[in-house]
């Protein structure tokens, strides 16, 4: 009888284990995806900015940094694309921190500064990073910032070289200091090449300023009506509409954040590369190596943080002489001979 009882007990235990293992795994929350985990790997949580992945710009660049870290450093990650970067981002950052699973939590974009600070104060032992904002005097937050005005100076120089109407345009998402840095550098670079050139800036505004291609196209068409024949954008996914307008109207455009040249080959002269992917990868590498620093990082041309593409589709259009001039301008920015202001 005793043996029978023991056997029944073992059988019951096995049935319980099998039944638990057969249950469907919990699904991630809406907007959240998980990369496959490996034992002992650093886990990174990331909350994207407005527009999310697929913008072929800012967010996609951050994602490339994660992918590289996964491949080269063996990290795993969870990612979240908020529909509302306000309360939704705050909740997701807190959820990551509360889990205790993440060695690093990254907030992509200036709009999450207040949310990140609030959560970082609640979890002082948790490492955080924010892109495109400055958080100081917090021992657990690293800030990754870029000298967009320097890269945009090069874009302005290219625009001035290629403009036949002596009028160039800029489409920004929202009129905030960060986006205005792009326009400021653009103007300075254009006037360095052609002091009398005219620049017209226009901003999209609204709650979907970084993800409204239709609005981007409409704004670009307004600039074209005012004789702008080269248009530079700093508007995330909204810029896709700028490219569409440029292609239809037979003018040039300039991309931003990622290499967007192949979206409309020959129409997009170049793109202002903002190497968010490099910054994200390097920070993750520091964390995996145990050297996380809670400081403000600044990435300019000298630090390979910003710059132009390789003009894959437009070398012949721009010409060797102009490309040589661009290299000279770049060298002067690196040496400090040309100083670029972040404001107009």
Give, region by region, the residue ranges found by the protein language model.
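C-terminal motif of bacterial Sec signal peptides marking the signal peptidase cleavage site
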Residues: 16-19
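Positively charged n-region of N-terminal signal peptides that target proteins for export
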Residues: 1-5
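Hydrophobic helical h-region of N-terminal Sec-dependent signal peptides
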Residues: 6-14
